[in-house]
A protein has these predicted regions:
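Helix-to-loop junction immediately C-terminal to a conserved catalytic motif
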Residues: 52
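Conserved ABC ATPase "signature" region
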Residues: 67-68, 105, 109-112, 116-133
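Conserved ABC ATPase signature
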Residues: 79, 138-148
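Conserved catalytic loops of ABC-family nucleotide-binding domains
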Residues: 83, 183-195
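Conserved signature/switch motifs of ABC ATPase nucleotide-binding domains
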Residues: 137, 157-158, 189
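Catalytic Walker B motif of ABC-type/P-loop ATPase nucleotide-binding domains
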Residues: 163-166
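N-terminal Sec/SRP start-transfer signal
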Residues: 236-273
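Alpha-helical transmembrane segments
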Residues: 276-295
Length: 295
């Protein structure tokens, strides 16, 4: 169970304060498709970022599986983001020089999963979104809808409890948008999906619950959690603290250097010129100083 109590968020710029969220109270069920609906600037993305642990609330409390996040340290937040949350954004954020499979594997690499298991789980996730035959393609060889499917596969490969989608169809045509929404609707059968959108048609057609935001406040909720649902016993899911090994980090770094040979060579060449230039200046300075001392 995910619950927000009296959440506020204030951004400060010098002496100016902007209150993005104003006392948000809402609870979410473990399996539902929630659409957060509102115009630009009403606080939708800020709310999504706080739920995903990408931003911190100013006051109030975010309660995850019965535990207050006021008790969370940085490792707890890392574990929450790595294992409990999947992110799907309007921009796909795929690495262009990596294959589709490698892009999906990356989420597991950062979680310290072994190579063999990484590949098996990444292939399974891509098959689930209908891209099992596109494993070796580069992102720039795919359509916008296919790239969004890759992003969804990357989001679900860690089997998160919650999937956060920020305008997932914003950059897609209407036909592709329907395909992506059908896919999200299927995933929502066993996960909590929270989708931010300004499109009421998408919300009414696909979501099981629509929450309306206006000026940082919830002004409508057509299927709120009942008191019995929020007070029900919570099953706490223990997540292990995991991290990428040093060997894996080095392997990724070397692979990145090798896939961008031209840039690596140019960077090394430019660095060499800089080092040689500094050495030459120091040598000339030392030579002039020695000459002056002997005159």
């Amino acid at each position: 169970m995910l619950e927000l109590k009296h959440i506020t968020k204030v951004y400060e710029a010098g002496t100016t304060q902007v209150e993005a969220l104003k006392g948000i109270d809402i609870a979410f069920r473990e399996n539902e498709f929630v659409a957060i609906l509102g115009q630009s600037g009403c606080g939708k993305t800020t709310l999504l970022n706080i739920i995903g642990g990408l931003d911190r609330y100013t006051s109030g409390d975010l309660i995850i599986n019965g535990r207050s996040t006021k008790e969370y340290d940085d490792r707890d937040w890392d574990t929450y983001r790595n294992h409990s949350i999947g992110f799907v954004f309007q921009s796909y954020n795929l690495i262009p020089h990596q294959s589709v499979l490698a892009n999906v594997e990356l989420a597991l690499t950062l979680s310290g999963v072994s190579g063999e298991e990484r590949r098996a789980r990444a292939v399974e996730a891509l098959e689930k979104v209908g891209l099992g035959d596109q494993l070796d393609k580069a992102p720039n060889q795919m359509s916008g809808g296919q790239m969004q499917r890759v992003a969804i596969a990357r989001a679900i490969v860690n089997n998160p409890d919650i999937l956060l989608a920020d305008e997932p169809t914003g950059a897609l045509d209407s036909e592709t948008s329907v395909q992506i929404m059908n896919l999200l609707q299927e995933i929502a059968k066993d996960k909590l999906i929270i989708m931010v959108t300004h499109n009421p048609e998408l919300a009414s057609k696909y979501a099981t619950r629509t929450v309306r935001l206006l000026d940082g406040r919830i002004v409508g909720d057509d299927n709120p959690c009942t008191e019995s649902e929020t007070s029900a016993p919570v099953t706490v899911k223990v997540k292990e603290h995991t991290s990428m090994s040093f060997a894996t980090a080095m392997s990724l770094s070397l692979h990145n250097l090798m896939t961008k040979k031209a840039r690596t060579l140019l960077t090394a060449f430019a660095g060499s010129i800089g080092i040689i230039g500094i050495a030459l200046i120091l040598s000339l300075s030392h030579g002039f100083q020695s000459y002056i001392n002997t005159v």
